């Protein structure tokens, strides 16, 4: 598999609600392109993409995988992103390096909550968008209803580029509205024929609507079309289709069924022909507010690490998008964050778990490199002065305390999870200094469950979750005064001293009890100045264990305001 030129690259991320067939669509694309001999993940065939034991067990994707497909002169890098809520951070990372987000929608269920969330994320990233309406062979499938729901939710810029040839049990292929042909997948070959007469009127009406939508990409043609002066030629339609998709004027909607592999050939044809290349996308935002144009003409290589993976067999793997220039094995680049050098010893194209070594990678392409020190979100360049703006990961809202069943494994546990958190910024690990517990923060419970299963599988360390011990605090509600007295006689010189303390609530700006203040209000030398710090120290020592339940005391102001002592007995003199 050679390195594609920038203009031939199509980076497409598959997103949508979990369980709608995104991975199955990618597997169908691999099969129909000849990359795999059989349709992965179907009829007992092992999947190429969801290869992780946790993915196999749970039957959904938990990590982004890549399916590079050579089709009609284009390299289509399909990024199959997990969209289960706990792992959606990977989807955001994948979207940040693609030019097009392809939403897979179930023909029975329509657009669901995760689809909506990711739709607006793609809009914020200014990605081109497309929709594949899947599972049209199911009994309750309806392309028309799904189209209505999509347009109701996302607007009227969406338009069909293919229609279903039958639905439910009668679904037998698609009608291509650009080429005005019917297509049926027979094995891995798409058989083209004339549109059946019973679908002719529907197809012509949909074709006219498609022309009207994409004509908005050209003001002059739009006016002529609306005034009825002319219809769009095939050449004009195809040219406008590319422009309208790249400029986000139009969202193409495809009909199909990835298990039956119907409509997938046409989808790949249109991705290769009409979807934007990296140079059409524009510029990558930089951390300093500037931007970097993705270009093969710039001879200064810049690479962006959008994902890191700790593979038990292959070690640490960095997923990279080449932003400018050409990457080659042996190239030394500087990390903008650490200012340290990283050497690209080898470059690979990755398909699922399989890796194929390549001699170079051009701007716009997505490749992987092993054993880099770079972390997710890092930018590598010749000067180290270029730093891409980091994408925003979802907030970690789930916290749990864990501990090793064998107390001797605590350090091994912490080290493994710390490395996993560096690869996935949606997770973090911390050791609570007060309670001594190891705390994991993550997006959700399933994410932690996968992490602990991998910990046991790869290190044989068994960990369990335990309740987080809450670091309670004690405080006071009203002011009080008290006297403390010290008196000691040991046969020789005696010790005597007493002091009066006033303790009052200390309320912070937010209205909560917080902090500690010590005030010296002693006058007339009633207590020697040299002993005042000892009073403060004694108060703070007492605060550590609290008064009522043994929790630390906070939110108090303590004033020492009176006292007495016998100087001759305790041998103290004023400085």
What are these regions (language model features)?
Residues 1-573:
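Structural and coupling elements of P-loop NTPases
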């Amino acid at each position: 598999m050679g390195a594609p030129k920038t203009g031939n690259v199509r980076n497409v991320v598959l997103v949508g609600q979990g369980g709608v067939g995104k991975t199955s669509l990618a597997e169908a694309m691999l099969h129909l392109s000849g990359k795999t001999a059989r349709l992965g993940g179907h009829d007992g065939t092992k999947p190429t993409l969801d290869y992780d034991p946790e993915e196999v067990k749970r039957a959904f994707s938990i990590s982004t995988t890549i399916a590079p497909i050579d089709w009609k002169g284009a390299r289509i890098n399909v990024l199959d992103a997990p969209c289960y809520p706990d792992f959606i951070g990977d989807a955001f990372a994948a979207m940040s390096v693609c030019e097009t987000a392809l939403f897979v929608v179930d023909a029975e269920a329509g657009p669901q909550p995760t689809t909506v969330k990711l739709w607006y994320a793609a809009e914020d990233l200014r990605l081109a968008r497309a929709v594949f309406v899947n599972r049209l062979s199911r009994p309750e499938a309806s392309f028309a209803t799904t189209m209505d729901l999509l347009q109701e939710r996302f607007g009227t810029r969406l338009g069909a580029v293919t229609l279903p040839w039958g639905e439910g049990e009668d679904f037998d292929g698609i009608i291509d509205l650009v080429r005005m042909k019917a297509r049926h997948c027979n094995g891995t070959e798409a058989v083209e024929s004339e549109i059946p007469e019973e679908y002719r009127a529907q197809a012509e009406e949909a074709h006219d609507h498609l022309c009207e939508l994409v004509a908005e990409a050209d003001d002059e043609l739009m006016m002529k079309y609306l005034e009825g002066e002319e219809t769009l030629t095939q050449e004009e339609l195809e040219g406008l289709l590319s422009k309208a998709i790249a400029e986000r004027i139009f969202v193409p909607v495809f009909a199909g069924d990835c298990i039956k592999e119907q409509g997938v050939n046409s989808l790949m044809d249109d991705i290769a022909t009409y979807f934007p290349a990296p140079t059409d996308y524009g510029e990558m935002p930089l951390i300093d507010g500037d931007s970097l144009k993705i270009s093969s003409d710039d001879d200064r290589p810049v690479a962006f690490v959008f994902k890191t993976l700790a593979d038990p067999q292959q070690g640490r793997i960095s997923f990279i998008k080449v932003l400018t220039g050409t990457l080659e094995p042996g190239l030394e680049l500087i990390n903008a964050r650490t200012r340290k050098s990283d050497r690209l010893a080898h470059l690979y194209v990755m398909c699922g778990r399989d890796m194929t070594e390549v001699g170079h990678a051009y701007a716009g392409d997505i490749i992987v490199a092993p054993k880099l020190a770079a972390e997710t979100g890092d930018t590598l360049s010749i000067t180290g002065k270029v730093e891409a703006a980091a994408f925003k990961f979802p907030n970690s809202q789930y916290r749990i305390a864990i501990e090793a069943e064998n107390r001797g494994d605590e350090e091994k546990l912490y080290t493994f999870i710390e490395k996993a958190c560096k690869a996935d910024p949606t997770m973090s690990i911390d050791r609570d200094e007060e309670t001594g517990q190891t705390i994991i923060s993550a997006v959700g419970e399933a994410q932690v469950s996968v992490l602990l299963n991998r910990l046991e599988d790869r290190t044989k360390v068994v960990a369990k979750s335990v309740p987080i011990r809450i670091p309670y605090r004690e405080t006071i509600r009203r002011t009080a005064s008290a006297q403390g007295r010290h008196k000691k006689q040991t046969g020789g010189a005696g010790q005597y001293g007493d002091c009066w303390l006033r303790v009052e609530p200390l309320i912070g700006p937010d209205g909560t009890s917080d902090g500690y203040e010590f005030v010296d209000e002693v006058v007339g030398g009633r207590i020697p100045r040299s002993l005042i710090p000892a009073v403060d120290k004694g108060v703070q020592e007492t605060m550590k264990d609290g008064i009522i339940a043994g929790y630390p005391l906070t939110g108090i102001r303590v004033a020492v305001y009176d006292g007495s002592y016998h100087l001759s007995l305790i041998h103290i003199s004023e400085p």
